Regions:
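Transmembrane alpha-helices of multi-pass small-molecule transport proteins
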Residues: 48-63
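Juxtamembrane transmembrane-helix boundary motif
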Residues: 1-21, 30-38, 42, 62-142, ...
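Transmembrane helix boundary and interhelical junction motifs in multipass membrane proteins
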Residues: 23-31, 147-157
Length: 264
């Protein structure tokens, strides 16, 4: 029974990795959904999801950066601001009754905006540095609070602001998620004093997301055009939003306090 459950979870996270990696995402929110449905304890869910996020975002970073659409000039100030903010946000506790609804509303709004046809073309504009830094801090802090890599917030924002094209958005999101996920997991290791992931459980899942992430990142980096990436990203965000609302009242093995301590 245990082996069968792990197999089902592995198949589910493989699908999530394939879907999310198409747009340069690591699939952290999707992995959390799968683990929540599988009734994995919260203290195991977040570090496991972050580890899987690191695996997938490593693949998507390699695939999308190789397309030549990576914006280093925009990426560096974003991560310089987001990483320390994500560390700080990871130690902030919020009421569990507010956690999923807040994220669900944010993702739903972003998805709807992405389905609205754009008026312009693939032209982009150069943002002011202080605005980039402020957005990096906000996204990092928000990601730290809710426990994700931040791509679900970064992608629609920089695309809708006209800072990046669809391809550039995917190439930016992948390494952004990678560094923030590493920061989050590192923070957990420091906080707990040991490696917080059960490798006997996580390794089969990691192998599954390698397959899914490679498939999705290959398709996304080479096959899909501008509107295709916008559509897929919108679908991904809708799925993540629906997941937040559907699982609002399903908290497996709840912790003693009525708060969610996130891990960035």
């Amino acid at each position: 029974m245990i082996e069968a459950n792990i197999l089902l979870i592995a198949v589910a996270v493989l699908v999530m990795a394939a879907l999310y990696s198409t747009v340069g995402h690591g699939g952290g929110s999707g992995d959390l959904a799968v683990l929540a449905i599988a009734a994995i304890a919260p203290e195991e869910m977040r570090p496991t999801a972050l580890l899987l996020n690191i695996v997938v975002s490593s693949i998507t970073t390699w695939k999308f950066v190789a397309t030549g659409t990576f914006r280093k000039d925009l990426f560096l100030p974003l991560v310089c601001a987001s990483i320390p903010a994500a560390f700080f946000g990871g130690y902030v506790e919020i009421p569990s009754v507010l956690y999923k609804p807040i994220v669900g509303v944010v993702l739903l709004f972003a998805a709807i905006r992405l389905f609205v046809p754009t008026r312009g073309t693939e032209k982009t504009k150069q943002p002011l540095l202080y605005i980039v830094l402020c957005i990096g801090v906000v996204i990092g802090f928000l990601s730290g609070i809710i426990g994700v890599g931040g791509g679900i917030f970064l992608s629609p924002l920089i695309l809708l602001l006209g800072w990046t094209t669809a391809k550039q958005t995917a190439a930016m999101s992948a390494p952004f998620i990678l560094v923030n996920s590493v920061a989050g997991l590192s923070g957990m290791i420091v906080d707990r004093g040991d490696f917080p992931v059960d490798l006997s459980f996580a390794m089969p899942l990691a192998l599954a997301v390698v397959v899914g992430g490679t498939i999705g990142a290959t398709i996304g980096s080479k096959k899909l055009g501008h509107q295709g990436l916008r559509t897929v990203l919108g679908v991904v965000l809708l799925i993540a939003s629906a997941k937040m609302f559907i699982t609002m009242n399903s908290t497996p093995n709840p912790p003693q306090s009525d708060t969610v301590k996130s891990t960035s």
